C-alpha cells in the first residue's frame, strides 16, 4: 500500500477551496425550518403566482352534516343550528335517493387551520387527532363490501401523526407522506428534493444531535406554564422575542475565500499608478483612496487608445476599407484592363493579386524613357505607321505634360518640361507661316460661311481634340467632349449627380467654375482664322505650365479614411445651353473631318504659334444634343492618363503620345471603367489615408 501524504501542502495553506458544506445545510440550520409554516417563519405574504392553484376536488354529494359531532361540546349555537339544518336536508335527500348515495372510504382531512402562534405545528397534529376521533363514518348500504377503519388503526394514525410532528420539530429527516397536508402554499408547490443517502458517520452524528433535541423538547409542563405567565405579565418582552427569532439563512457568508485567481487578478480599481509603476492600494495606508477615481479614468483612457491603435493598424494592413472599394477591386472588368505592374518586388505575388493591383508602374518600363526622348525622328516614323494602321489622321497634336503616377520619379517630369519648352520655342518661329497659309486658303470665302465652316471642321480635327482633351485632363474630374464643351454645359448622367470625387468613387463631374476664357471664346466667334493656332498653343501652355495643377492633384490624392463622408471638390458645371439646330451641322462634321485629314501640313503648323492672350477658335453653337453623341466620355475625350498604354506609346511625350492615348481611350468600354482605373493607379501610397 502506498503511503499517501495527508498533511496540508503549501498551496492548501495559502489558498482554500470552497467546501461542499456550504451547499448542504447543517442540522443547526435545518432545525428551525422543520414543520413550520410560512407565517411562522415571518413570511406574512405568499408570493403571487401566475397560474391558478389547483384545489383538490371533492364530490359534493355528502355534506358536513354527516360528520359525527357527538363527542364534542356543542357550545356554539351557530354550529348546532347549521348541523340541524344540514341533518334535515340530508335525511330528506336520503329518503328520495337512497340507492344513489355513496359513503366515503375514510375520514377527510379538515380545512387548514392558520394560527400565528409559534407552536401551531403541535396544535395541528392534535386537531387532526381530535377530528379523526370525532368523525365516524355513516351507515353504509348493505351491498357495500368496503370495511370501515377499525379504532385501533385510527389510534395508530394519531400516534404516528404526533410522533411525526415531534420528529420534524426536532429536526430529524422525516419522509413526506402523500396524505399529510402541506403547511403552506409555497411548500405545496416547491418541495425540497430528496437528499442523497448520508454516510454512516453523518448518520451517527445526526442520531446524537436528535437525542439532545428530544431531551430539550420533552420538558415538563411546569416550565411551559411559567413561561406563559411571564408572557402575560410582560407582553412587550414577548414581542421582542418574537421579532428576534429570525430563521437562520441557509448559506452563511464566511467572507470571500482567498483563492489563487482572486489573489493574482484584482480589479484595476484596487491599484494606483505612482512613479511609473502600479502598486496595490493598502487599506492601512492613508491618502490612497482619493486617487482611485483618477486611476479608473486613466484605465479607460488606455483602453480607448488601444482601440484606436487597433483601428489604425487595420487600416494600414488593408483590412479596414469600404465595401465600395472592394466592389471595384473584385470587379469582373479588371481582366479588361492593362496590367501596369511587373516590378521585381512583386514577383512572388500570385497572378490574381497582381491583376487586382492596378496602381503599379514597372521600373523596367520607365527606365528607357530618356533614351526614347532622344530619338524624335525614329519615334515619329514608327508612330505614323501605327496611326495609318488604325485608320486615324496622322496630323500631330499639341504636346501635353503628363501627370505623375506614384511610381515615376520627379526627374522625368523635369525632363518633360524642358522638352516642352524647346518645342514651343520652335513653334514660335513657325507662327507667321501658319497665319499666312490660313489667310490664303480662306480669301474667297464669305465671312459667315467661313465661320460656320471652321466651327464644323475644327472640333473634329486632332488639334481641337488635343486642345480640349488637354484642358479636360485636369487634376480634377472629367470635362465633356469637344462638342459638348463648345455648348458650354455637359449633359449630366446619374454618375455626375450622385458620386463624390474622393474616397474611392468615380470622378466624372466637370469643375463648376465659369472661366473668363470661356466667355472670351464666346465673344471671339467670327474673328480671324489665325485664332485656331493661338487657341491650341494657349491650351498647351495652360496645361503644361499651370502652377496650381500639381497642388490640386496632391490634395485629391489624399483620400480620407474609408467609411467617412467626403466633400466633392469638383462640383458640377452650371453653364447654360445655347439652343441651335442640329441636323445640318452633324453632316458637315464628317465632311470637314475628311477635308482636314487630307491636309496635315497646314494643321501641323497651327500648333506652333504661342500668343500672349487666349483667342479660341470658333465653335459649334447649340449642336450635338442628339443622344447618339452623348456617350459620357467615350467619344474622343475621356480623362487623360486614365489608361496605362503599352511601352512604346507610354514613353512618348509629344503629339504622337497624345494621339495614341486618344486611340486607346476610344476603345474603352465606358468612362466608368477608365475612372476606376485611374483611381486604382493612385491608391498604393495614398489610398488608405497615409500622408
UniProtKB/Swiss-Prot annotation:
Motif (ST]-E-Y-X(3)-F motif 2): 184-190
Top-level lineage group: Eukaryota
Feature: compositional bias, Low complexity: 461-475
Keywords annotated in UniProt: Coiled coil, Cytoplasm, Cytoskeleton, Microtubule, Nucleus, Repeat
Short motif (ST]-E-Y-X(3)-F motif 1): ranges: 9-15
Subcellular locations according to the entry: Nucleus; Cytoplasm, Cytoskeleton, Microtubule organizing center, Centrosome; Cytoplasm, Cytoskeleton, Microtubule organizing center, Centrosome, Centriole
GO molecular function list: microtubule binding
Ranges of Basic residues composition bias in the record: 234-243
GO biological process entries: negative regulation of centriole replication; retina development in camera-type eye
Biased composition (Polar residues): 514-533
Name of protein: Nuclear protein MDM1
Organism: Gallus gallus (Chicken)
Source organism phylogeny: Eukaryota, Metazoa, Chordata, Craniata, Vertebrata
Amino acid at each position: 500500500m502506498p503511503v499517501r501524504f495527508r498533511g496540508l501542502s503549501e498551496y492548501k495553506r495559502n489558498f482554500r477551496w470552497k467546501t461542499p458544506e456550504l451547499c448542504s445545510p447543517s442540522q443547526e440550520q435545518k432545525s428551525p425550518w422543520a414543520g413550520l409554516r410560512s407565517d411562522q417563519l415571518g413570511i406574512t405574504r405568499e408570493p403571487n403566482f401566475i397560474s391558478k392553484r389547483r384545489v383538490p376536488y371533492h364530490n359534493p354529494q355528502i355534506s358536513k352534516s354527516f360528520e359525527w359531532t357527538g363527542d364534542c361540546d356543542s357550545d356554539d349555537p351557530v354550529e348546532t343550528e347549521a348541523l340541524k339544518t344540514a341533518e334535515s336536508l340530508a335525511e330528506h335527500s336520503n329518503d328520495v335517493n337512497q340507492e344513489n348515495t355513496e359513503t366515503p372510504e375514510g375520514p377527510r382531512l379538515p380545512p387548514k387551520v392558520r394560527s400565528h402562534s409559534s407552536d401551531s405545528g403541535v396544535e395541528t397534529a392534535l386537531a387532526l387527532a381530535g377530528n379523526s376521533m370525532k368523525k365516524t363514518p355513516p351507515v353504509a348500504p348493505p351491498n357495500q363490501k368496503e370495511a370501515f377503519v377499525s379504532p385501533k388503526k385510527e389510534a395508530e394514525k394519531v400516534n404516528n401523526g404526533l410522533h411525526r410532528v415531534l420528529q420534524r420539530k426536532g429536526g430529524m429527516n422525516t419522509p413526506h407522506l402523500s396524505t399529510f397536508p402541506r403547511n403552506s402554499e409555497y411548500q405545496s408547490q416547491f418541495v425540497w428534493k430528496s437528499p442523497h443517502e448520508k454516510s454512516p458517520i453523518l448518520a451517527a452524528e445526526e442520531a446524537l444531535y436528535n437525542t439532545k433535541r428530544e431531551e430539550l423538547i420533552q420538558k415538563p409542563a411546569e416550565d411551559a406554564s411559567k413561561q406563559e405567565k411571564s408572557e402575560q405579565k410582560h407582553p412587550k418582552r414577548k414581542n421582542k422575542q418574537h421579532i428576534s427569532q429570525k430563521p437562520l439563512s441557509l448559506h452563511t457568508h464566511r467572507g470571500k475565500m482567498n483563492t489563487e485567481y482572486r489573489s493574482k487578478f484584482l480589479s484595476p480599481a484596487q491599484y494606483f499608478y505612482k512613479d511609473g509603476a502600479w502598486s496595490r492600494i493598502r487599506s492601512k495606508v492613508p491618502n490612497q483612496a482619493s486617487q482611485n477615481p483618477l486611476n479608473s479614468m486613466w484605465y479607460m483612457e488606455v483602453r480607448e487608445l488601444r482601440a484606436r491603435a487597433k483601428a489604425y493598424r487595420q487600416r494600414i494592413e488593408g483590412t479596414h476599407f469600404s465595401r465600395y472599394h472592394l466592389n471595384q477591386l473584385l470587379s469582373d472588368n479588371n481582366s479588361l484592363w492593362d496590367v501596369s505592374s511587373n516590378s521585381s518586388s512583386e514577383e512572388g505575388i500570385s497572378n490574381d493579386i497582381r491583376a487586382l493591383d492596378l496602381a503599379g508602374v514597372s521600373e523596367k518600363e520607365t527606365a528607357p524613357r530618356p533614351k526614347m526622348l532622344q530619338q524624335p525622328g525614329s519615334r515619329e516614323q514608327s508612330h505614323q505607321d501605327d496611326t495609318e494602321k488604325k485608320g486615324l489622321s496622322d496630323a500631330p497634336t499639341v504636346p501635353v505634360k503628363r501627370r505623375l503616377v506614384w511610381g515615376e520619379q520627379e526627374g522625368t517630369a523635369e525632363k518633360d518640361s524642358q522638352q516642352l519648352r524647346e518645342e514651343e520655342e520652335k513653334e514660335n518661329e513657325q507662327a507667321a507661316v501658319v497665319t499666312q497659309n490660313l489667310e490664303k486658303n480662306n480669301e474667297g470665302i464669305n465671312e459667315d460661311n467661313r465661320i460656320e465652316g471652321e466651327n464644323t471642321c475644327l472640333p473634329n480635327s486632332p488639334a481641337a481634340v488635343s486642345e480640349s482633351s488637354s484642358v479636360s485632363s485636369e487634376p480634377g474630374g472629367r470635362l465633356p467632349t469637344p462638342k459638348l464643351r463648345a455648348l458650354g454645359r455637359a449633359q449630366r448622367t446619374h454618375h455626375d449627380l450622385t458620386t463624390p470625387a474622393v474616397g474611392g468613387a468615380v470622378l466624372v463631374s466637370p469643375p463648376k467654375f465659369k472661366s473668363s476664357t470661356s466667355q472670351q471664346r464666346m465673344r471671339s466667334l467670327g474673328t480671324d482664322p489665325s485664332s485656331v493656332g493661338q487657341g491650341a498653343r494657349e491650351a498647351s501652355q495652360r496645361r503644361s505650365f499651370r502652377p496650381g495643377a500639381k497642388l490640386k492633384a496632391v490634395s485629391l490624392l489624399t483620400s480620407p479614411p474609408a467609411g467617412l463622408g467626403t466633400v466633392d471638390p469638383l462640383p458640377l458645371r452650371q453653364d447654360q445651353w445655347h439652343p441651335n439646330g442640329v441636323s445640318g451641322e452633324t453632316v458637315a462634321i464628317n465632311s470637314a473631318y475628311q477635308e482636314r485629314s487630307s491636309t496635315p501640313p497646314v494643321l501641323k503648323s497651327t500648333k506652333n504659334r504661342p500668343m500672349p492672350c487666349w483667342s479660341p477658335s470658333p465653335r459649334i453653337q447649340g449642336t450635338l444634343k442628339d443622344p447618339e453623341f452623348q456617350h459620357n466620355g467615350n467619344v474622343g475625350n475621356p480623362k487623360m492618363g486614365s489608361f496605362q498604354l503599352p511601352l512604346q506609346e507610354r514613353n512618348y511625350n509629344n503629339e504622337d503620345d497624345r494621339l495614341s492615348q486618344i486611340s486607346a481611350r476610344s476603345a474603352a468600354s465606358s468612362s466608368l471603367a477608365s475612372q476606376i482605373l485611374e483611381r486604382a493607379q493612385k491608391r498604393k501610397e495614398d489610398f488608405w489615408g497615409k500622408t
